[in-house]
Amino acid sequence: MKFLALFFLALAGVAFAHDGGMGGMDMIKSYSILGAMIGLGIAAFGGAIGMGNAAAATITGTARNPGVGGKLLTTMFVAMAMIEAQVIYTLVFAIIAIYSNPFLS
């Protein structure tokens, strides 16, 4: 049941992408929005898993050796920034795919 609700929620972007009267262009725009949503969802999901693993490893390392907690925290922040950068790159790609799609011009 949850998968069905998620499926219909994902297709809501396709329903809102319909402008009417554009011929085949509305299909390209619909698939651009759907692809952007799926890509951004996968990137955010993977980033969240990576951030959770990084935080768990940092907490475990600090619990085992409190003396290196500061160095581990700095390394964790760098890793978090790199993980978040991948999600931001996917967001930029999704925005480009939606608003400046070369197949729509």
Curated annotation (Swiss-Prot):
Compartments annotated for it: namely:
Cell inner membrane
UniProt xrefs under Pfam families: ATP-synt_C (PF00137)
Q: Which InterPro entries match?
A: ATP_synth_F0_csu, ATP_synth_F0_csu_DDCD_BS, ATP_synth_F0_csu_sf, ATPase_proteolipid_c-like_dom, F/V-ATP_Csub_sf
Membrane topology of this protein: Multi-pass membrane protein
For site (Reversibly protonated during proton transport), what residue positions does UniProt give?
A: 84
Q: Which residues span the membrane?
A: 3-23, 32-52, 78-98
Q: Which domain of life is it from?
A: Bacteria
What cellular component terms from Gene Ontology apply here?
plasma membrane; proton-transporting ATP synthase complex; proton-transporting two-sector ATPase complex, proton-transporting domain
**UniProt keywords, alphabetically:** ATP synthesis, Cell inner membrane, Cell membrane, CF(0), Hydrogen ion transport, Ion transport, Lipid-binding, Membrane, Transmembrane, Transmembrane helix, Transport
A GO molecular function annotation here is:
proton-transporting ATP synthase activity, rotational mechanism
State whether keyword Ion transport applies: yes
Its assembly, as annotated, is: F-type ATPases have 2 components, F(1) - the catalytic core - and F(0) - the membrane proton channel. F(1) has five subunits: alpha(3), beta(3), gamma(1), delta(1), epsilon(1). F(0) has three main subunits: a(1), b(2) and c(10-14). The alpha and beta chains form an alternating ring which encloses part of the gamma chain. F(1) is attached to F(0) by a central stalk formed by the gamma and epsilon chains, while a peripheral stalk is formed by the delta and b chains.
Q: What family, per the record?
A: Belongs to the ATPase C chain family.
Q: What exactly does this protein do?
A: F(1)F(0) ATP synthase produces ATP from ADP in the presence of a proton or sodium gradient. F-type ATPases consist of two structural domains, F(1) containing the extramembraneous catalytic core and F(0) containing the membrane proton channel, linked together by a central stalk and a peripheral stalk. During catalysis, ATP synthesis in the catalytic domain of F(1) is coupled via a rotary mechanism of the central stalk subunits to proton translocation.
Tell me which HAMAP family the record gives. ATP_synth_c_bact
**Identification of the protein by name:** ATP synthase subunit c
Organism whose genome encodes this protein: Helicobacter pylori (strain G27)
Annotated gene? atpE
